[in-house]
Amino acid sequence: MNISTMNLDQELAEIRASSSDHTNYFYSSERREHMFDKVLTPSDVGKLNRLVIPKQHAENFFPLEDNQNGTVLDFQDKNGKMWRFRYSYWNSSQSYVMTKGWSRFVKEKKLFAGDTVSFYRGYIPDDNAQPERRRKIMFIDWRPRAEINFVHNINNHNFVFGSPTYPTARFYPVTPEYSMPYRSFPPFYQNQFQEREYLGYGYGRVVNGNGVRYYAGSPLDQHHQWNLGRSEPLVYDSVPVFPAGRVPPSAPPQPSTTKKLRLFGVDVEESSSSGDTRGEMGVAGYSSSSPVVIRDDDQSFWRSPRGEMASSSSAMQLSDDEEYKRKGKSLEL
């Protein structure tokens, strides 16, 4: 061991002894100045056993003399342990690197690619010395990379998954009385819901700060809403549908009595309630997808099973008996 190495070891021991009592002080004091951070790359923690220092930081904080090939830098970690790294400039790659001692630091701290190493500088307190004569010291710290969990419980986190991928997407609110807790879903629905959130399907969930859930509908959902005048989200493939507050009008009550007759070669059902001889007549023999309803009053209407309003193509209204009398038939039975 040569004299220069002995002097460095002796100086390092003195720094360790004089700064051990001030470890917590430095890491909680404003006198510790932050220099820079370095996010580790795979090569920084690989078999090359070297840490590349960004050029702007190296020239600013660790400058080398023109005729100097390298030097030794000493750092103290938050536990008070001293670390010594060989610092030099590589002409082949034109980069500043820390080599000797770095692999041991990586192994002991269990560093991986994506972790961050931070460098600080300060000085050892000495009330008897002038500020410019105080012994300077540098610090090194580390922190692991931020972990990202892609599957979250929707009751505990406010994240956005599966945002719509089409430009005409809209978000529709789901009122609390119609929203089902996530844990109340059967296990099959829970698994399907998590998979769709992770894979980023064309519809998703947004939970804002006040706990109101929103679901993004597809263009087909918007088509139904324009035609039906409703605002209930449409979610496909085993995902429960959450209706909004507005409920479509129900069908008219069933008539109490029904009479059948044949009119113009068509079976006609005459229903009456409360003793009224004239009432609602449904014309049989038509397609169930487009029912025809004959009403003799102008005040009421009802929707077909598809939610379509009865129109001139699917319903006929007779204001009186003149239409039947004109054709030679009477409505009276």
UniProtKB/Swiss-Prot annotation:
An example Gene Ontology biological process: leaf development
The keyword DNA-binding belongs to this UniProt entry's keyword annotation: yes
DNA-binding region in chain numbering: 36-145
PROSITE patterns noted in UniProt: B3
Stored Gene3D superfamilies: DNA-binding pseudobarrel domain
CDD domains assigned to the protein according to its UniProt record, in alphabetical order: B3_DNA (cd10017)
Main location: nucleus
Biased composition annotated in UniProt, kind: Basic and acidic residues: 323-333
Matches recorded under InterPro entries: B3_DNA-bd, DNA-bd_pseudobarrel_sf, LEC2-like
GO terms for cellular component: nucleus
Function according to Swiss-Prot or TrEMBL: Regulates lateral organ growth. Functionally redundant with NGA1, NGA2 and NGA3.
Name of the protein described by the UniProt record: B3 domain-containing transcription factor NGA4
